[in-house]
């Protein structure tokens, strides 16, 4: 039997390991706090301290015990930058100048500091400084903790920011304004995206300088360029504004840590963008959501030799449904995506509070049972 790390790396090299590797609890495929507590109640365990003590997100805990119980092959290292920049200052703003409103379990930006800014204001706007938001000591302590767990896991660096270039630009500028800017004010978009790319590049540099030798994968701050039925912006606009900055960020990662695989997150019906994600240098794309507009088997056939897929498990209906439905989805997804390697099974997004703990457990037992190579005929 392969070690978890070898299992993951074999799959990402487009070869078949002993079974399909499994992931959970990354930046976009985590266990929300309420589900975490419910799962612990089922197991009779006490919670661990939160890795985000500010408790400002829906996912604030990370429990290696639960990952071991589920048979997950990856472990994550948090750069700390999201937690630090989420802290609210005396003016009510976070590290990016955003202010938030809370609705139910979630919060969203309600004050957008650059909504009316011109290019000069954008260029002068203060953004987080890497040395102030990423500290070496907790990162190195976490790496040592993972190495002491007893199994050799694939180590994933979590994203250095909650939002990618597109989504953070929307938050700072305001969603509707940024979308209009894409069509009418190209110099504003180029200035803002350029500033963010330089900020993120500095964050990635510092994280990799501390942890790069230990990491096997790293999550790039993700962007949703598509909705459930198709693109939010045109592929041409992606090429105009985002392709070059993301290419530069990935080259920056590879220059510091050539061995590290880059995970790129983009929700929705992303088929029109997949070739572009390959062009920018992404090694893995998450989440490949199961949507009517997404033909999983066709995407595997067309792109599976050039990029790996992570995710694929529906979190909107399947995970709230029957255990039989979960088993059926796992079987279908493995059949569509796992042949020849290049697939890591994971939720398509964070598992929410309405997921019964038994369904979380069943997802991963089914994946271990059905994901053994060589794949069964008809899987």
Predicted feature descriptions by range:
Residues 1-39, 45-49, 93, 99-108, ...:
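Active-site loop segments of alpha/beta catalytic cores
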Residues 33-80:
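Segments that shape or occlude catalytic/ligand-binding pockets
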Residues 65-69, 84-93, 145-149:
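Short, charge-rich binding segments
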Residues 73, 80-81, 89-92, 101-116:
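A composition/biophysics-driven feature that prefers long, compositionally simple stretches
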Residues 77-89, 159-162:
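Short, glycine/charge-rich beta-strand/loop segments that flank catalytic centers
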